[in-house]
Structure formats: C-alpha cells, structure tokens
Amino acid sequence: MAPPKPSAKGAKKAAKTVSKPKDGKKRKHARKESYSVYIYRVLKQVHPDTGVSSKAMSIMNSFVNDVFERIASEASRLAHYNKRSTISSREIQTAVRLILPGELAKHAVSEGTKAVTKYTSSK
C-alpha cells in the first residue's frame, strides 16, 4: 500500500540524506560568505524600526560585491600602471574617485580616510 500523499498546505520537504564519504566522516557544508550581517547592522543604525526581505538583502549583497570588485580591479590596474606590486590606500582612494560619481566619491573618500585613521590610531 502506498503512503498517503501530504496535503499542499503545510507539506514538508523530504529530508535529504547526507551521503557519507568512504572514510566514514560527514561532509561539512561549504560556508557561503555574504555582507548581510553588516548590511543589517547599518540598516538598524539608520532606520531602527525597518526590516529587510531576503530578496532585498540578496540584491544589496550583489551590489556590495559588484562595487567591491569594480574598486579592486581599478586599484589593481592603477598599481600595475605605476609598476607597484602592492595595492595601498592611495590606489583604493584613486579607484573610488574614478568609479563613483561626484558628491558620492567625495563622501566615500572622506569616510574611507576617517576609517583608515581610526584603524591606524587603534593599533
């Protein structure tokens, strides 16, 4: 006799069995890194009573990754042009000035400078 079919409402997904490797140890899940914790912290600083959906968080995470990649590649290009093997805060600052438009670049540079100063003074 076939088992009864679960109703559509409240149906649970079948539990996935973890296939054991030959040495008998369970495989660990690969950690998925994201900026969601930090995005959430900033949101709570700016708007304490506002929440964020998982879809919106995913979009914000993609945005942060995209901006990070653009700045990193531009800074890398600048270091290569100047025959440097190390990306310093100067390359990052120049990359930010090149990538971000007008007033946004000015604010980003001042916040970045403030963060670097705070970091170096705490050492």
Swiss-Prot record:
Stored SUPFAM superfamilies = Histone-fold (SSF47113)
* Key words of the record: Chromosome, DNA-binding, Glycoprotein, Isopeptide bond, Nucleosome core, Nucleus, Ubl conjugation
Q: Is Glycoprotein among this UniProt entry's keywords?
A: yes
**Where does the UniProt entry place glycosylation sites?**
S110
Q: Where is this region: Disordered?
A: 1-31
Q: Which GO terms describe its molecular function?
A: DNA binding; protein heterodimerization activity; protein-containing complex binding; structural constituent of chromatin
Q: How is it modified after translation?
A: Monoubiquitination of Lys-118 gives a specific tag for epigenetic transcriptional activation and is also prerequisite for histone H3 'Lys-4' and 'Lys-79' methylation.
Q: Which positions are linked by Glycyl lysine isopeptide (Lys-Gly) (interchain with G-Cter in ubiquitin)?
A: K118
Q: Which GO terms describe its cellular component?
A: nucleosome; nucleus
Q: Is this entry keyworded Transcription regulation?
A: no
InterPro entries the record matches: Histone-fold (IPR009072), Histone_H2A/H2B/H3 (IPR007125), Histone_H2B (IPR000558), HISTONE_H2B_site (IPR055333)
Family from the record: Belongs to the histone H2B family.
Role description: Core component of nucleosome. Nucleosomes wrap and compact DNA into chromatin, limiting DNA accessibility to the cellular machineries which require DNA as a template. Histones thereby play a central role in transcription regulation, DNA repair, DNA replication and chromosomal stability. DNA accessibility is regulated via a complex set of post-translational modifications of histones, also called histone code, and nucleosome remodeling.
What is the name listed in the Swiss-Prot or TrEMBL entry for this protein? Probable histone H2B 3
Q: Which organism is it from?
A: Caenorhabditis elegans
